[in-house]
Design a protein with these regions (language model features):
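Rossmann-like AdoMet
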Residues: 1-133
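Alpha-helical subdomain
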Residues: 39-72, 178-184, 188-329
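Phosphate/oxyanion-binding active-site loops and adjacent basic polyanion-contact surfaces
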Residues: 107-122, 147-151, 178-186, 214, ...
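A structural alpha-helix within SAM-dependent methyltransferase catalytic domains
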Residues: 119, 155-159, 253-258
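Conserved class I S-adenosyl-L-methionine
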Residues: 133-149
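Conserved SAM-binding loop of SAM-dependent methyltransferases across substrates and taxa
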Residues: 147-167
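Conserved SAM-binding motif I beta-strand of class I
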Residues: 170-178
Length: 329
C-alpha cells in the first residue's frame, strides 16, 4: 500500500513558477483522500455546527468567513482545484493559513466526490460513443471550466479503460471561461501529460482557452458548427447550473443544441433545492455569503421544458449535489 501511495505525481507550473500537482483521480493519494462515510457523518453534523457558529461573537464569525476563502461570492477555479487535490496531494505546496486549514476539512471532501463521480458519468457516455464511431474526433466544451479537471480526468478514465479508443483521432478541450488562471494551468497540465513517458504521450490533444461570459453564449453556435462531425460533450461542474440564472442556462443549452450532433450530451452539477438540501450546507453557504443557486432537480426539469434537451440520468450526493446528463429529445 505504501508503494502505491508513493506513486509518482506529475507537476505543472502555475503562476510565479509555482509547481502544482496535476490532479489525477486514479492516483492512490486522491482515492485515499475520500472517506464517504466520514463525509456523510460530516453532512449530518453540519446543521448543528452552523447553529453553534451563528451564536459566536461577531469577530469570531468574521474570522471564519475570511477563512472560507470566498471571493466575489464564489470559490475560484484554482482554489477549488486545491481543495480537490486534498491534504495528501497538496502536501508540499506552500499554502497560507486559510488554505492549510480548509484543505483538511471533511466538508470539502464533497468537491472530490463530485469531481470523481462526474468523470465516471462522462467517461461512461463517451466510451460507448468512441467504440461506436472510431472515425470521429472528440470535443469537450467546458463552461466555467477553470483548470478543467473533469475533462482531463474523463480522458484519463477512458484511457485506463481502453487506451486504443483515444489513438488516431483529434481531441479538443475547449475551456469557456472569463477566468484566465485556471485555463492557463490546464494548458500546462496537458503539455506535461503529452511529454514522453506521461499519460497522453502520442495523443493528438489540444486545449483551447475561449474568453466566455455565459450571458452571451453565441460562441457555442459557431464552435459546435465547425465540429459538426465530432463527438461533442458540453459540461459545467460547479459552474453554470450552480450560479447561472434560468435565462442563462436556457440560452446556453439552446445555443449548444442548434449545431451539435444528434448524440451530443450535456453534463453538470447542481445543488438540491432549498426544501431538500442539507440544512448545514444551506446555512454554511448563506453564512459565508456564497451566491449559489438551489436549483434542484425540479428546477432543472422546469428549465428543460424551454429547451429540446431531456434528462438522461442523475446521481445524488448526500442531499447537496446532483450530477446529471442531458440528451437531445
Amino acid at each position: 500500500m505504501k508503494a502505491n501511495l508513493d506513486q509518482r505525481i506529475p507537476y505543472a507550473v502555475f503562476e510565479n513558477e509555482i509547481q502544482l500537482p496535476i490532479l489525477d483521480i486514479t492516483h492512490p493519494l486522491f482515492k485515499a483522500s475520500i472517506d464517504e462515510q466520514a463525509y456523510h457523518l460530516s453532512c449530518l453534523k453540519s446543521a448543528r455546527s452552523i447553529e453553534s457558529l451563528k451564536k459566536m461573537p461577531g469577530f469570531i464569525r468574521n474570522i471564519f468567513v475570511k477563512m472560507s476563502n470566498v471571493d466575489n461570492s464564489y470559490l475560484g477555479g484554482m482554489r477549488t482545484l486545491l481543495y480537490k487535490l486534498g491534504p495528501d496531494l497538496s502536501r508540499g505546496i506552500k499554502l497560507g493559513f486559510r488554505d492549510k486549514w480548509a484543505v483538511k476539512q471533511t466538508s470539502f471532501m464533497g468537491l472530490r466526490i463530485r469531481l470523481r463521480d462526474l468523470c465516471r458519468i462522462q467517461s461512461k457516455i463517451l466510451l460507448a460513443q468512441l467504440k461506436d464511431f472510431p472515425e470521429r474526433n472528440l470535443c469537450f466544451y467546458n463552461i466555467a471550466g477553470g483548470p478543467a479537471p473533469d475533462s482531463i480526468n474523463t480522458l484519463i478514465l477512458i484511457q485506463e479503460s481502453d487506451p486504443e479508443l483515444l489513438k488516431g483521432r483529434k481531441i479538443e478541450i475547449n475551456i469557456l471561461d472569463i477566468d484566465t488562471y485556471g485555463p492557463n494551468f490546464a494548458k500546462r497540465c496537458i503539455d506535461v501529460l503529452k511529454q514522453p513517458g506521461e499519460r497522453f504521450h502520442g495523443l493528438d490533444i489540444t486545449l483551447n482557452m475561449i474568453h466566455y461570459d455565459w450571458s452571451g453564449p453565441e460562441a457555442l453556435l459557431q464552435m459546435s458548427l465547425e465540429r459538426s462531425g465530432w463527438i461533442q460533450l458540453c459540461s459545467s461542474e460547479g459552474g453554470l447550473f450552480e450560479y447561472g440564472s434560468d435565462s442563462d442556462i436556457i440560452e446556453n443549452l439552446n445555443h449548444f443544441y442548434t449545431n451539435s450532433p444528434a448524440d451530443a450530451r450535456v453534463t453538470g452539477s447542481l445543488i438540491f433545492d432549498r426544501a431538500h438540501v442539507n440544512p448545514g450546507y444551506l446555512g454554511f453557504t448563506e453564512f459565508i455569503g456564497v451566491q449559489i443557486r438551489y436549483l434542484g432537480l425540479e428546477g432543472l426539469q422546469r428549465i428543460l421544458t424551454q429547451t429540446s434537451w431531456v434528462l438522461e440520468e442523475f446521481h445524488e450526493i448526500d442531499t447537496i449535489y446532483i450530477l446529471f446528463s442531458l440528451k437531445k429529445a
